[in-house]
Amino acid sequence: MDVNTGNVLAMASYPSFDPNWFINGLTPEQVDYLMKSDEAAETTPARNKAISMKLAPGSIFKMCTGFAGLMEGVVGIDETIDDESPYYVKDPETGEAIMQNPVKCWTKYPQRHNNQTIIEALKNSCNYYFCEVANRLGIDKLADWAKKLGLANRTEIELTGEAQGTIGGQQDLYDTGKLQAWVKQPVRG
């Protein structure tokens, strides 16, 4: 996407198909390929997955988490956070881990990112740093900032089938499946 105009410069969806198939009519095999059964509807080649699938944003959401943390004052621009990977999500009442698989940074143990500022954490895409910022914010403030930044809205791109964003909140906090899928940076009690 062109950051100045919002114009789409490139887009891909896989599996793909050859649009020339439609010139002389589709064979039964091509129809079957394009219109997979309902249980595989999300992966049908006829669907533009780049704009229609609702997927966890992954590391791109770290910018939202960091911005929200700075705006709410829970992290300073020059403050460092030590990567003590892995990041365990804990029940605030019991202190027990509520996730069997703690969030790990992409670096391999024993390597870690050590003390980092937000700029270094973005550069290194450090999961631990943004888990800690998300924890300091709380899930509802993080969700509010995601909404303020327009992540719950359609982009109004001139292509049909665009899905609207979905943002979780406190009610999703202890559904660990939703929590992991929501931001890939869960909060810790």
Give names to the regions the model predicted.
Residues N4-S59, C64-G189:
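Beta-lactam-recognizing serine transpeptidase/beta-lactamase-like catalytic domain environment
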